Amino acid sequence: MNLRLTGAKALPEDDLTMRIAVAAAVEIGLLAVVAQDVLSDRTAILALVLAPVGYVVSYRRRAATNVAVKVALACGLFVATARFLGQIGYVTSPDAARAPLAALFLWVQVLHAFDVPRRRDLAFSMVSSTTMIAVGGALALTTSYLWWLLAWAVASAWWLWASSRRTC
């Protein structure tokens, strides 16, 4: 009996409209967290610049195997987790843990942007952008946060429309 354990690999997603909608939703989620002023300026600027760069790189390399990119991203995730664990060691209350956790979520989202070749990966990015919006909402102190939520809802509706035009 000769069983093969690997399944068929999904095709890369070529729909640029869907990719732009996902990138917009992610960027809005990142902006919503950055606007709460719990991150360093350097972290905020890097995240806001690197996420769109990541989506462009991912689009251009969507048909490649990207092993080196995946190894680099795994290393980046280890660094982000190590920074989070280092920062969380000095936390004196559960409320004070929100900022380091927000930074960790932010870096996971940014790093993930560099490897989203398939529709399924784009859907994971949308779920992650939902998490970013929730984190921003948990950190928000005023009702003006609703504007971020509204902008994200528009981008999410755009993604739903784009993903419903063609099914896999």
Identify the function of each model-found stretch.
Residues 1-168:
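Linear, non-domain "peripheral" regions
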